[in-house]
Swiss-Prot record:
Enzyme class, first EC level, given as a word: transferase
Subunit structure: Interacts with UBE2C/UbcH10 (E2 ubiquitin-conjugating enzyme). In vitro, interacts with cyclin-B.
GO BP: proteasome-mediated ubiquitin-dependent protein catabolic process; protein autoubiquitination; protein monoubiquitination; protein polyubiquitination
Chief location: cytoplasm
Protein encoded by which gene: UBE3D
UniProt-recorded name of the protein: E3 ubiquitin-protein ligase E3D
Species this protein is from: Bos taurus
Catalytic activity, reaction form: S-ubiquitinyl-[E2 ubiquitin-conjugating enzyme]-L-cysteine + [acceptor protein]-L-lysine = [E2 ubiquitin-conjugating enzyme]-L-cysteine + N(6)-ubiquitinyl-[acceptor protein]-L-lysine
UniProt KW keywords: Acetylation, Cytoplasm, Metal-binding, Transferase, Ubl conjugation, Ubl conjugation pathway, Zinc
Protein purpose: E3 ubiquitin-protein ligase which accepts ubiquitin from specific E2 ubiquitin-conjugating enzymes, and transfers it to substrates, generally promoting their degradation by the proteasome. Independently of its E3 ubiquitin-protein ligase activity, acts as an inhibitor of CPSF3 endonuclease activity by blocking CPSF3 active site.
Residue ranges, annotated region (HECT-like): 353-389
Length: 389
């Protein structure tokens, strides 16, 4: 995708399932100027006295110019119009553990922030998902015998890795070097198979990267450690550590997580809480089939944050698969009443991440919201954002 000039701001959201697109053309100058707009199946061209902007669409994306409808000018945004569009299917989400390619391979666990090796050359013979929240209810409903695993923890063996919603459970008994917790040995008590174990809050169980001091996870027993998916990269040992911008990695992990949960459990609302049990964000998945294409032009009202160095900069173009979410921040007692309602709602799923990652995610969502055209930033009482896949 290339731009001849970057005078106009262009925003295009293509919905694959609906085969429709919302196109917003805005001029960077207050008050607007006369503009000639040309839409072809593979490009957009905006000609104004101030210059010309041409946006070529990615391969696989096609517009239907004859279907343009709903043309209107929205103050602060520019021209809005809708039209039919087609986009190639989004690549299927691939789990970190692709059983066909990584089975029986040695894997290395890295700290995503700095690349420090956490576990080297671990042969994972079994990668198993932990039972879902409704596992106990299903056993009681459908089985003629009591649940044999009730009130028992599920701990991985030496060459096992158990996967939760947003964490891994790994047995570190045989590792010569283990990431050590900050405090005393952990004590656990067991509730049910839905919550395979709970940590007593009085014990400090954080596992810290010895190089960058980032929290990677928590110890759950003398042999088992929980690593958060947002902090760890797992690769076949023969592959080199990839440098992935932090915000890009956090977005992709969380986006994949909520899409998989919504598909498996018909869950669309999530509370994002820290390891300190505080709720930081209320997240509502709106759709997961968006392709977002934008050229920011001279959009200069974007503050820069070090953690977001890879997010769109002025005079840049971007095309990405994304999930569209609604969110509400809950820090500093904001939205406390709504947060309490969600926490007590059985249809809302809770995701736990390190508290610093929750704050990073909130910053990412706020940044995404700030780059949207003003008319798209709010829906009802929620703020709107896109998480890149």
């Amino acid at each position: 995708m290339a731009a001849v000039a970057a005078e106009a701001r262009v925003f295009l959201e293509v919905r694959r399932r609906l085969q429709s697109a919302l196109l917003i053309l805005g001029d960077s100058k207050e008050g607007g100027l006369p503009m000639a707009v040309s839409v072809t199946p593979s490009s957009l061209r905006m000609q104004s006295p101030g210059g010309c902007t041409e946006l070529r669409l990615p391969a696989g994306v096609r517009l239907a110019p004859s279907t343009c409808r709903g043309l209107q000018h929205v103050p602060g945004d520019g021209l809005h119009l809708r039209l039919h569009a087609r986009a190639e299917s989004r690549p299927e989400l691939i789990s970190v553990f692709n059983q066909s390619s990584q089975d029986q391979e040695c894997c290395t666990f890295y700290c995503q922030s700095c690349g420090e090796v956490i576990i080297r050359d671990r042969m994972l013979l079994r990668v198993l998902p932990l039972p879902g929240d409704n596992w106990g209810a299903l056993v009681d409903e459908w089985c003629c015998h009591p649940d044999p695993f009730a009130n028992k923890p599920l701990h991985p063996r030496e060459n096992d890795c158990f996967t939760g919603d947003c964490f891994y459970l790994v047995n570190l008994k045989s590792d010569l070097w283990q990431p050590r917790p900050e405090g005393a040995p952990v004590e656990t008590h067991h509730l049910s198979s839905e919550n395979h174990l709970k940590l007593k809050p009085k014990a400090n169980t954080k596992v810290i990267c010895k190089r960058c001091k980032v929290m990677l996870g928590e110890t759950v027993s003398s042999e088992t450690t929980k690593f958060y998916m947002t902090e760890i990269i797992i690769l076949p040992s023969e592959r080199n550590f990839p440098i992935i911008p932090r915000s890009q990695f956090v977005q992709s992990v969380l986006a994949q997580c909520v899409v998989e949960l919504s598909s498996a459990r018909s869950t669309f609302r999530f509370t994002i809480q820290g390891h300190d049990d505080k709720v930081y964000i209320l997240l509502w998945l709106l759709n997961s089939d968006s392709l977002v294409i934008e050229s920011l032009g001279q959009y200069t009202n974007i503050k820069k944050f070090p953690v977001l160095e890879d997010v769109l900069k002025p005079d840049s173009n971007s095309a990405c698969n994304a999930v569209k979410v609604l969110y509400q921040p809950c820090i500093k007692s904001r939205n406390a009443e709504l947060s309490s309602l969600w926490e007590n709602d059985l249809s809302v799923h809770s995701l736990t991440l390190p508290s610093t990652t929750c704050l990073e995610l909130l910053l990412i969502l706020s940044k995404s919201n700030a780059t949207l055209p003003p008319s798209l930033r709010c829906m009802n009482s929620f703020q709107v954002a896109f998480l890149k896949m």
